[in-house]
C-alpha cells in the first residue's frame, strides 16, 4: 500500500486509492481489480512459503494502516467500485485474502489476524466498525485475533503511546530531505498519546465480550501483574514488544521469578531507530558503553 518503499519494491507502490502518505513520502497508484486479485493470491502463496520454512502459524496484518487496513479505512479508501464505500465492500479485499490464506493453510497452519479496534483519529474506523470486521474474521475462519489500534501514516503514537524522539528518528533517516522535514515538522505531525499500562484493555474487553475465538491482548504490558490481568480477563494470549527489546530474556526471568517488571521506560528510542539497521534499547546501549 502507501507504506511501501519504491526503493525496495522497484516499482511504484499500489494502494486502494492514490492518497499520498506524507511519512514516505509515497505517491501510490490506485490498484486495478486485477491488481487486487493478484495481491490476494500472493497472500496464499506466502502461506506455502511459511510452511516450507517450517512455520506452523502465520499472521495476516489487517491493522495499523498497512495495505489491508487501507482498504478497510474510509480515510484511505475512496474507491467507487465493489471494494469501496460500505463496510462490506471495504472488507471485500480482506475476505478474499482470508479465502486464499485459509485454502493454503489447510489443517496444519494456524491463521492469526492482527486487526484494529480503532484507527485512532477522526475520519478513520471507529470501534463499532472494527468490531464488525472482527466478527467477519471469526466467520471467515481466523484461528485467533491480535487486537490493536492506530494508523502508522496518520496516528502512529496511538499504536505505541508516549512520544516519539523526533531528533533520534531523523538522525537515522537516509533521505536528507526527509531528515530536514522531520526535524522541522515531525513534532506537529506525530502527536503524543498518553501512555499507561494496559492501554488497550478497556477497548479489548468489548471485543472479548462479543467474540468466541481466541484473542491476543497487546498494549502496555510491562509486568507480571499486567500479564496476569490480561489472562484473568479471558484473553488466551498476550503479545509484547518494547519489554522484550529491552530484555529478550524477560519472559524466562519472570518464569524463574528473578524479575517481575520490565525496566523499559517507554521512551520509544527503540521505535525511533526503525530507519537504522537495528532496533535497540538505549538502556542497553548505555550499559554497553560503560563496559
Tell what function each PLM region has.
Residues 1-291:
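Flavin-dependent oxidoreductase catalytic cores
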